[in-house]
């Protein structure tokens, strides 16, 4: 998605060898008009897949996932990172390691929101080592639902997340794919959509 790549180049900050800070439009402050376009692009890419639910993980995946769900006219579910006292039964859980935060969290979704009839589109803000997506896949599979695709706003293609997901048989759709950071500059490779 050319507009997203341009925004990353303009407002993204490279931190070290493998971190991209995009807090001015995605991971802290949200540019809703860009998120709306992102939602429309993902929706167009999966319009014939029979998707019934959009699933993400809190927190930065929520904004793009809401707009994807809106564009598809479907519910969006987000996995919670903290146990909530109102979530008391039928909880689906998985362990997820955060590359950026360097911590492992138990994420959960109430089982009543997913079932074996569902066809799921996973949406997340970043794909690095694939652990967030892997955790969501575990939860979705616990419900007996089918994963149709994993939609990623920004993929760090120089890390092994895509390979992990594709080797497991999942379709990955990334809007912006970063080949690497060279001397503090962002280098893109061809995106999926």
Curated annotation (Swiss-Prot):
Keywords: Cytoplasm, Glycosyltransferase, Purine salvage, Transferase
Any single GO CC term annotated in Swiss-Prot or TrEMBL for this entry: cytoplasm
Enzyme Commission number, as recorded: 2.4.2.22
Keyword DNA damage: no
Name of this chain's protein: Xanthine phosphoribosyltransferase
Record-listed xanthine binding positions: 20, 27, 156
A GO biological-process term: xanthine metabolic process
Functional description taken from the UniProt entry: Converts the preformed base xanthine, a product of nucleic acid breakdown, to xanthosine 5'-monophosphate (XMP), so it can be reused for RNA or DNA synthesis.
Family: Belongs to the purine/pyrimidine phosphoribosyltransferase family. Xpt subfamily.
The keyword Transferase is assigned to this record: yes
Binding site for 5-phospho-alpha-D-ribose 1-diphosphate: 128-132
One example GO MF annotation: xanthine phosphoribosyltransferase activity
Domain of life, source organism: Bacteria
Subunit note: Homodimer.
Catalysed reaction, written as an equation: XMP + diphosphate = xanthine + 5-phospho-alpha-D-ribose 1-diphosphate
Subcellular localization(s) per the UniProt record: Cytoplasm
Pathway(s) it belongs to: Purine metabolism; XMP biosynthesis via salvage pathway; XMP from xanthine: step 1/1
């Amino acid at each position: 998605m050319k507009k997203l790549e341009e925004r990353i180049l303009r407002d993204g900050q490279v931190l070290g060898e493998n971190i991209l800070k995009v807090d001015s439009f995605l991971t802290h402050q949200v540019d809703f008009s860009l998120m709306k376009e992102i939602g429309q692009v993902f929706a167009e890419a999966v319009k014939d897949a029979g998707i019934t639910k959009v699933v993400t993980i809190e927190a930065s995946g929520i904004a793009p996932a809401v707009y994807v769900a809106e564009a598809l006219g479907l519910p969006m579910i987000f996995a919670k990172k903290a146990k909530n006292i109102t979530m008391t039964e039928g909880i689906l859980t998985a362990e997820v390691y955060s590359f950026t935060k360097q911590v492992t969290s138990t994420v959960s979704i109430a089982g009543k929101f997913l079932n074996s009839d569902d066809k799921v589109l996973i949406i997340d803000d970043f794909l690095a080592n694939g652990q967030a997506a892997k955790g969501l896949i575990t939860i979705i599979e616990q419900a007996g639902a089918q994963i149709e695709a994993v939609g990623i706003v920004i993929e760090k293609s120089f890390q092994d997340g895509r390979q992990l997901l594709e080797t497991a048989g999942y379709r990955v759709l990334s809007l912006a794919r970063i080949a690497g950071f060279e001397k503090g500059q962002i280098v893109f490779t061809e995106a999926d959509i």
